[in-house]
Amino acid sequence: PAIDLRLHTSVERVDLHLGTVDAAIRYRETPEPDLYCTLLYEDRFIVVASPTLGLSRPEDLQRVTLFHVANRRVPADSPSWENWRRRYGPPTLNIDAGLTFSDETHALQAAVAGQGVVIASELLARDLLQRGVLSAPFSNALPGARYYLVTTEAVAQRADIIALREWLLSQMASGDGGHPTAG
């Protein structure tokens, strides 16, 4: 939209009622009861790997390096290899082996290079999947949380915030594999 934005990225929560920030995008499981919340995207976590690895069955995971991501700030069940094995197998998958990354984007880049496989946010991996440098060999997914645009009730009705909300919804809807919903 034709508005000026100042982006501040942080995992620290900003109090919108103080009036120093007009809107925020928050990753959580449920809307916040004291704020105007618009659901932008329902995230899922999927297994992604370079197409060169030729993964087609869950058993194929036993022959590749598993990438683990530490310190994810995911309010839902952890998108871990332990949870993957419990839900989808194979039961003999050695989930204690592999490499651990402190940042999911670094794990994705290593996966692009064909060095292993990672359980990644579908939203974060979307562009890499669309370009064909990563593939999602299995249809199974682990649940993630939801991205919400949040504002106070008073700010929600401003023209610039309405324009931002509509633009964000259209951007989220334009990608393949997305799960956007207005709310």
What are these regions (language model features)?
Residues 7, 25-27, 47, 66-68, ...:
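Generic preference for hydrophobic
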Residues 18, 30-115, 120, 124-144, ...:
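C-terminal regulatory
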Residues 1-33, 181-183:
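Central regulatory/effector-binding core of bacterial HTH transcription factors
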Residues 24, 40, 132, 150-151:
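A generic membrane alpha-helix/interface feature
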